[in-house]
Amino acid sequence: MIDFNNSKNAFSDKSDFDLFRAFFLFKTLNYPIISKFLTDILKVILYLRIPIDFLIKLTIFKQFCGGETISDSSKTIDKLWKSSIGTILDYSAEGQENEDDFKNVFDETLKVLDIAKDNSKIPFVVFKLTGLIQFNILKKLSKKQELSEKENATLIRFNKRLDIICKKANKINKPIFIDAEESWIQTAIDNIVFSLMKQFNKEKVLIFNTVQMYRHDRLTYLMNLSQIAQEEGFKIGLKIVRGAYHEKEIDRALEKGYTVPVHEKKSDTDKDFNNALKFCIENINHISICSGTHNIESSMYLLKLMEENSIENNDDRIYSSQLLGMS
């Protein structure tokens, strides 16, 4: 069994400076007052255009970012691979609003696929749909509202680009994670990913949807998806996470006067997350998963489930992932 308390193994690839920087950053971020003060100072510095790029790159950027460009990330990719850790290149673009931005995200995603081709160091490619289409269009689709002529033209271009991305990923056999986003556009995302799964996940799992378990409806969603997949003869891919928009979800629900879609207690999110792992492992013959968590208990629980079901640690239907610098 893996021992997460073995810091000698966990940090064997880190220099003393790396460990000191991480300790300093996390210690600082652990104090809200200090964290807010430094954030306010940073805003003033940026407003005054005082050059501090070098300082950010040595601290926050170095801890949490692999690089500014794909080629710039190669050193981080190689370093992680020495510890048998793969890299998921995430082109951080969401909420784009104009055609030039969509085209740029599309082109960058294809570049990532080119680099990931035949490269075992990069097992997946990930992107957000809001990097390829306006947020408001996904919002309208989620509410089943009619699109304007211009929005329909944008949707057609989006579908063509998404088809090109998925067909290229299929050709080079490189799975895709499509990130979850806010609940008021997630229905459209779910529907789009569902169609892609039906098309590309017949023999293997190429397309993964992301399920945010802080939403109290997601366990039911993935169970229903599993049943439909078995009935219609395709496999499903799921990246299971706790969620990224908790405060935003609560604030909007209270403002608009609808039921808050996320769990009030973290313990309920933890419970649903672990139940999702259990369900997926019990249905591993048609479900591939990526457990996206920094939580030790959930990570240990996944290993326990695998052992109980006689699943090898290197089974390619099961991955675990963390954000760079967070584990």
Question: What is the role of each PLM region?
Answer:
Residues 1-327:
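Positively charged, amphipathic and often flexible ligand-engagement surfaces
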